[in-house]
Design a protein with these regions (language model features):
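Conserved acetyl-CoA pyrophosphate-binding loop and the N-cap/start of the following alpha-helix
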Residues: 100, 104-112
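Conserved beta-strand in the GNAT
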Residues: 61, 67-76, 90, 95
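Conserved N-terminal entry element of GNAT/NAT acetyltransferase domains
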Residues: 1-15, 158
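A short helix-loop-beta-strand connector motif used in the catalytic cores of GNAT acetyltransferases and
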Residues: 47-61, 90, 146
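Conserved GNAT-fold acetyl-CoA-binding loop/helix
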Residues: 25-48
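Conserved active-site alpha-helix within GNAT-family acetyltransferase domains
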Residues: 107, 131-149
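Conserved GNAT acetyl-CoA-binding A-motif
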Residues: 118-128
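Conserved acetyl-CoA binding element of GNAT-fold acetyltransferases
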Residues: 84-98, 150-153
């Protein structure tokens, strides 16, 4: 049995994390994700957090460098003033390769994020789950999360 280890991502992990993120988006699109993804979506995703890594965004991975088999991206954000202007942790992306599902890899990644958020004194942590991802919703409930909001969307263009 292979020992699962969570580690901070390095520059050498970014391309593999971007490829894993693309797989995650393919899954989300199969469930009905309404946003179009440009050809360079993975690079734009990486660009969205690289400069804030270690301060307001955190990327943990599993697997050897350049061969990421699981990752979690977490971000720090602030609620609006009318909601107390508190700092909130956001787990924006979690992907575990099919070969590791059921191994506890996802839970280990979530534990790393929760530890960081507790260390930073976050008010709460939120996660968005794509509609139709029942297994994902069940996973988050097992992690102690509960449903608070439901997002609805109407497309204005075809």
């Amino acid at each position: 049995m292979v020992e699962l280890q969570v580690r901070d991502a390095t520059a050498g992990d970014l391309a593999a994390a971007g490829a894993a993120w693309s797989k995650l988006q393919e899954f989300h699109r199969s469930l009905g994700l309404a946003f179009p993804l440009p050809e360079d979506a993975a690079q734009k995703w990486l660009d969205s957090f690289q400069r804030t890594l270690g301060r307001f965004s955190f990327l943990w991975v599993m697997g050897p460098t350049i061969q990421v088999s699981a990752f979690l991206l977490a971000r720090v954000k602030q609620s609006p003033a009318f909601l107390g202007a508190v700092q909130v942790g956001e787990i924006s992306d979690l992907h575990v390769d099919e070969s590791l599902r059921g191994s506890g890899a996802g839970t280990l990644l979530v534990d790393a994020a929760m530890h960081k958020f507790q260390e930073l004194g976050m008010h709460s942590v939120e996660v968005q789950v794509q509609a139709g991802n029942d297994a994902g919703l069940q996973f988050w409930r097992k992690q102690g999360f509960h449903q608070e909001l439901a997002l609805v969307r109407k497309l204005l263009k075809d």
